[in-house]
Amino acid sequence: MTSHVLALAFLLHACTALAWQETNSRSVVAHLDSGIIRGVPRSADGIKFASFLGVPYAKQPVGELRFKELEPLEPWDNILNATNEGPICFQTDVLYGRLMAASEMSEACIYANIHVPWQSLPRVRGTTPLRPILVFIHGGGFAFGSGHEDLHGPEYLVTKNVIVITFNYRLNVFGFLSMNTTKIPGNAGLRDQVTLLRWVQRNAKNFGGDPSDITIAGQSAGASAAHLLTLSKATEGLFKRAILMSGTGMSYFFTTSPLFAAYISKQLLQILGINETDPEEIHRQLIDLPAEKLNEANAVLIEQIGLTTFLPIVESPLPGVTTIIDDDPEILIAEGRGKNVPLLIGFTSSECETFRNRLLNFDLVKKIQDNPTIIIPPKLLFMTPPELLMELAKTIERKYYNGTISIDNFVKSCSDGFYEYPALKLAQKRAETGGAPLYLYRFAYEGQNSIIKKVMGLNHEGVGHIEDLTYVFKVNSMSEALHASPSENDVKMKNLMTGYFLNFIKCSQPTCEDNNSLEVWPANNGMQYEDIVSPTIIRSKEFASRQQDIIEFFDSFTSRSPLE
């Protein structure tokens, strides 16, 4: 009798301990803090994993919740289908084009995709180890993009025993409009990211994940967001390390200046025909507008200004609002904020080549001829007194343009100033402040079958923005007709990059002590980086005269006092 009771007790314990349950060969379910969700079994290269798609991680920010910090989910009673990706957030895509499949847009876009190694599904009393978790923040200039699989296929990583989470967050006017009020405080998109990380903490074990072993990562604006989160007091204890691909909190392609936020907000209200000055009335009119109208106004702003419109902002403390960015990122870095977070950061050899067609369509050359200050990186533009802007533009023109305004010259100045300089400078700053290791790379491998170049109609030399991402995430875009079988070297490079990333996710170093299959990658000393040229050519290099020249040139501007 006693043995039967013990057996029954053990069975009951096992059933309640199961965070996961395989219901049949075509679906799996997970028990979250808000209810049960049903996902789908999948496989890649003969290795099984499970995906839970379109999982809400907070109450949808519609109606009175527009612009506000996300609120907790209401629990649901029935099993929620998580078998399809949810709608993407409202946006105007000016870059990704055919890389992104046509998707429904909605304000109700707060969804995550969770991809889990098959071995992690049924966890009984810890017989399967908790897995490390990668939370990836998509790029898109804080204006467009999504966590969908078109650019972020999880196959390369989830089949190596890492849980991969991608997600949507509010973008452009919906995510980064700031009126400096409690109802429209700004940085809503960053708060969405913090909400997602808190949700992951609460539910990690339900997915077989280790809540104490979370890596955040991002590409472009997603990398900048990830770095900003490492500098925020609001994220303490939410993650362990960060990977920054082509973006930092110091990046020159955006500015956190409240001056810019005030300027862009004023432009928006003019386009919408809102002439009120009372913040409450402005909020009421913005809330009453259909989301489509706000999205159309944002599209007009993008056409007028370029890629970047609504951006993260240094915040003033507001009652009842979680502060994400409490000071200029460069000041926070100099003070040592975030220095104990291990970083893996990188840039490509010709970042801004990816934007070439967009710049041509934008008629950039004529716009520069009409207004030379356009060549000034946004961050510098709002650090410089207005009377000195033309002088600054001429200094940049002498350095990069040699008297000829051309797309080629802009691409060069953009690559150096927007991406390479911030990465080099962050490496220097980390060496000065001490703290956790930082690993820096330059990705210069020109793949034989670059899906990015094919889809976007590019034929440039060098490696542009986004191209390194395709060796870490599988591109599952609608442009399957343009996919070619990867070359032997392409496969080797995919294995190399995923190897570095997987090691960093597991041991905070690109090369772990218990994995000798990769060449040892030394931590940065403020003057060195790994130059990834091919799967067999990876060199540790000291900053050359070219890098030193880039640092000295842009340092000469940042030494000026920023505008208040």
Swiss-Prot record:
EC number(s) of the enzyme?
3.1.1.59
User: What glycosylation sites does the entry record?
Assistant: 81, 180, 402, 515
Write the signal peptide boundaries: 1-19
Q: List the disulfide bonds.
A: 89-109
Catalytic residues?
220, 351, 465
**Catalysed reaction, written as an equation:** juvenile hormone I + H2O = juvenile hormone I carboxylate + methanol + H(+); juvenile hormone III + H2O = juvenile hormone III carboxylate + methanol + H(+)
Family annotation (Pfam families)? COesterase
Instruction: List the molecular function annotations (GO) for this entry.
Output: juvenile-hormone esterase activity
Q: Which Gene3D superfamilies match?
A: alpha/beta hydrolase
Record keywords: Disulfide bond, Glycoprotein, Hydrolase, Serine esterase, Signal
What family does the Swiss-Prot or TrEMBL record give for this protein? Answer: Belongs to the type-B carboxylesterase/lipase family.
Its annotated function is as follows: JH esterase plays a crucial role in the decrease of JH activity in lepidopteran insects, by hydrolyzing the methyl ester of JH. It is also involved in the transport of JH.
Q: What is this protein called?
A: Juvenile hormone esterase
Could you tell me which species this protein originates from? Heliothis virescens (Tobacco budworm moth)
